[in-house]
Amino acid sequence: MTERDFDTPVETPTVQPAPAQGAKPAQTVPVVAVVLAAGFGTRFDPDNPKQLVSVGGKPIVCWSIDAFEHCDRVSDIVVVVNPKVRGEVETLVGEMGYTKVRVIIDGGDERVDSTAAALDMLATAGIPDDAKILIHDAVRPFVEQSAIDGSIDALDQFTAATVAYASTDTVLLTEDLGDLKVVKSVPDRPNTFRAQTPQSFRFATIRHAYDLAAADPDFHPTDDTRVVVDYLPDEPVAIVSGAETNLKITTLEDIPTAERIAEEILGRDPKEEARARMHALLAQAAGQMHR
């Protein structure tokens, strides 16, 4: 990715008439997907980086890149890798013929370091402040297109958003008491969600949050949303509906579940899916007419 990819002036957004039912709003800013594939999970097989493990006949990292490559609204993809597997990922990108992958860069020891490396690269490339940045864990290979679209749409109203899935379990907040954990509080279940990715931001927002976090050597966030929540508390973070299938492959025990999801996806009939989407749109339109 070079500076010329992002140096086109962007007009100040103005209020436009609502688009027709089912139509997407006109896109005037870059939409950049950052696929984080730099982790070497200690809970996985240390000799086989999980990003390169095949699921459903395809490396996990390729599933994630595919999701953004096939989204018409995503303009560019940045892949962040561990230097040890850079060659393999570069080969895969070439073999798969991805047209939106602009650059593959080295990540850091922690997830936060990999995101920071991507943000630094984008700043150097001259990306505009209002660009939409979607940061996604490569090891969540089955992200739905609806989650990607929802993330992009959410940034029309907010400067930060995260895909999340409503918790079906009661969540306990704990504290230490002696050698044990004890329950401190029990939040209402309707207010609890499991964070997923992509996590999406206007570039200026996530860049500013990371600049503030960089001054705190003790801060080690597990995701990018928390950087905004902790360092820009006045910036609301919107929730975009996720799915149970958008799982994060963390251990070898997750592979059988991932294989079942991949088998279901590969077995879908595209014509039947298109027909189902059309029926859903017609039903939605009919419902609005009768309100």
From Swiss-Prot:
The keyword Transferase applies. Its EC number is 2.7.7.60. PROSITE patterns: ISPD. The record marks R43, K50 as: Transition state stabilizer. GO terms for biological process: isopentenyl diphosphate biosynthetic process, methylerythritol 4-phosphate pathway. It holds the Pfam family IspD. Pathway: Isoprenoid biosynthesis; isopentenyl diphosphate biosynthesis via DXP pathway; isopentenyl diphosphate from 1-deoxy-D-xylulose 5-phosphate: step 2/6. Belongs to the IspD/TarI cytidylyltransferase family. IspD subfamily. Catalyzes the formation of 4-diphosphocytidyl-2-C-methyl-D-erythritol from CTP and 2-C-methyl-D-erythritol 4-phosphate (MEP). This is 2-C-methyl-D-erythritol 4-phosphate cytidylyltransferase. The gene is ispD.
